Amino acid sequence: MQIHLNIDDLPAYPYPTNFLHFASIEPETDIEPWWLLVYNAGTINNWYKTLKQLYPERTLIPFAKFNANDDIACFDGDDFSGQPHVLIIHAYASEGWELHATYASFDKWLEEAMVQNAEWLNED
């Protein structure tokens, strides 16, 4: 499966290996209410630019969006370790109020996303 990770301002961002593996799995793993931004060219870049305009003091690498609100899961773009924290940013919130949650890694975020997926599916 082709994934699109290009960000004009950060052409060599070191995405976590586990994220790259997860995003490349075919068929795509259902994590609804979250969905990955990597499957359409330009989506990550567009969200990166939007978040940079909203929160210029932050460097946020968006990778997933929550269906029910404006929450965006982002890697900490100032962390080039290959294992950045995941920040849940409520897009369009007033600056200083945008951070909803933090996870130590992509794997920790994915664990929570899978819990949310099970809850989402049980609501039907």
Which role fits each region the language model picked out?
Residues 76-97:
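Intrinsically disordered, low-complexity regulatory segments enriched in Ser/Thr/Pro
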